[in-house]
Structure formats: C-alpha cells, structure tokens
Amino acid sequence: MRKPIEHTADIAYEISGNSYEELLEEARNILLEEEGIVLDTEEKEKMYPLEETEDAFFDTVNDWILEISKGWAPWRIKREGNELKVTFRKIRKKEGTEIKALTYHLLKFERDGDVLKTKVVFDT
C-alpha cells in the first residue's frame, strides 16, 4: 500500500507491505507511475544483495533510477536465496516526471505487527 504525503519535495509517499520485497514493489510502482513509463518486452536481469536495511533499500532504488535513465525499468522482483533478482524491461516511452534520486529523508523502517512501513522522498 502507498499513499502520497505532503512534503516540500516534489514526490513523497508513505509505503507499507508485509515484507521488504513488498516495499521494493511499492517503490517500483511509484517510479513507473510518476515517470509515466510504458514498457516494451525486451528484458534483462540484475541481482541485488538481500539485506533488509534502509541502506540497501536506498542503494537498490537509486540503482533502479540510474537504470531508468539508461532506458531500463524494474519490472519483476523475486527472492532467490540471499539475493533479489530484478527483471528489467526496456522502456518504450516516458510521459511523466523524471525522478533523479531517492533521498534518505524520512527513510526509516518501522514494524507495526506484520506490516513493514517507511516514507520515501524523491528528488525531481
């Protein structure tokens, strides 16, 4: 789940899920929707360490933003042992706001029962 939050940044959300992977999926959805990305069918894969920390989340999402700038968008996220396999799809077109980076501002994982949540603030 995600909901926009008021912030001085152009794009900020509170996101939640039952797992670290679900938080990453929400971040991916924000990137795809805010940037207005239309995907093609050509794919490539990339592996990421599965470390359920704010630092790893920050690094992973910012790497995705770099990949988007190169014409590839994260599409599928799958846990494989102690790594995450992310399948990227070639970007056909972008019609939204360019996101430059995820910031550390308000990025703090919190557990509420089975729900993991944080806030994400993006620079545009």
Curated annotation (Swiss-Prot):
Gene3D superfamilies referenced in this protein's UniProt entry, alphabetically: Archease domain (3.55.10.10)
GO molecular function terms listed in the Swiss-Prot or TrEMBL record: metal ion binding
InterPro entries for this protein: Archease, Archease_dom, Archease_dom_sf
Alphabetized UniProt keyword annotations: Calcium, Metal-binding, tRNA processing
GO terms under biological process: tRNA processing
Pfam families: Archease (PF01951)
Positions with a binding annotation for Ca(2+): H7, D10, D123, T124
Family note: Belongs to the archease family.
PANTHER family: ARCHEASE, PROTEIN ARCHEASE
Function: Activates the tRNA-splicing ligase complex by facilitating the enzymatic turnover of catalytic subunit RtcB. Acts by promoting the guanylylation of RtcB, a key intermediate step in tRNA ligation. Can also alter the NTP specificity of RtcB such that ATP, dGTP or ITP is used efficiently. May also act as a chaperone or modulator of proteins involved in DNA or RNA processing.
Protein name per UniProt: Protein archease
Species assigned in the record: Thermotoga maritima (strain ATCC 43589 / DSM 3109 / JCM 10099 / NBRC 100826 / MSB8)
Upper lineage: Bacteria, Thermotogati, Thermotogota, Thermotogae, Thermotogales
